[in-house]
Amino acid sequence: MSRLAIAAVTLMASAATYAAEPIALRDMGSFHVGGRLVEISGKPVKDVTFTPGGVPAKVDPNGTYQVEQMYVQYFLPQNEKGAYPLLLWHGGGLTGVTYETTPDGREGWLNYFLRKGWSVYNSDAVERGRAGWAQYPDIFKGEPVFLTTSNPFQRFRIGDGPDSYDPDPAKRKLMPGSQFPNAGYENFVKQNVPRWTTTDDATIAAYIAEIDRVGPCIILFHSQAGTFGFKVAQARPDKVKALIAIEPAGVGDPAKVDALKNIPTLMVYGDYIERDSRWPKIRATGGAFADAISAAGGSADVVDLPKVGIKGNSHMMMMDKNNAEVAGLIQTWLEGKGLTKK
């Protein structure tokens, strides 16, 4: 077993004591960032009754709207040990809840890294959660995409193949040795929110605005945010000190890979990649981009968790039962790159 895997196991063994220890903060808060103003005209004025039994009010939809902003909540530990703030970016159809807690009520990565002394900035991206979304098709083009309860069960490599989901947890067909907390799956899908496929440019602009406000930072991003994380780093290479890509569904601009050569990069992939028709291609795309970073003179480490003895992880590894073990591997990598304070 590699040094990273051994260290991760040690960290997992001590993680059980965390819940009894309070988290000491020097500050916490939130802000919105990014966005733009848009004019809408030519719409009819309507009478709207906002509250049952209330008095109707005239609502004129014509005018200026604030849209495409992003919400960020930050937590600053009393005893800061990270050399730079850690930004957490969620994946598609999700929000910052991804990192807050697990479907079965355990601590998420937000708390894990806070306890390790990192200042953590957790966001709801454009058109997600507390960022809000805009009218469509007037502003957002196309319709939002909604997922059924069963869709992520197979697509996120929790269930083993088609028809693996069942409303009864006991009847579900899980991947063999799955670490996902099956009994809490419905709590996970309650986190799912509508997503658009036409807002990438706005999302990248908002993430750039976040970095411009926060300053030099480390970005940990998941799934859909793979494209955002790499492209934002390519746009602000002087402000990004490390990239941690958790099963990135997309990558950056191959023509601008040189911009990443001074940014240490870690890619992490879970289990069962070969058991799903989509994931081998996604994994190959990420690996090829890591190779391109290395060829440009950069540092890109790719970790397939089963190969270092960490097995059973789904696409949602930050929620899996061994999430502290995976976080420990990331923490060890950050320490090895000199990104913690002495």
Where do the language-model regions lie?
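Gly/Ala-rich beta-loop-alpha elbow adjacent to hydrolase catalytic centers
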Residues: 220-229, 233
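Short beta-strand element of the alpha/beta-hydrolase
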Residues: 82-92
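Conserved acidic catalytic loop of the alpha/beta-hydrolase fold
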Residues: 197-218
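Active-site glycine-rich loops that stabilize anionic/oxyanionic intermediates
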Residues: 90-102
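The feature captures the conserved acid-bearing segment of alpha/beta-hydrolase catalytic domains
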Residues: 245-305
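Catalytic active-site module of serine/aspartate enzymes centered on a nucleophile-bearing elbow/loop
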Residues: 310-312, 316-342
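N-terminal cap/lid segment of alpha/beta-hydrolase-fold proteins
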Residues: 20-81
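Conserved alpha/beta-hydrolase
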Residues: 106-132
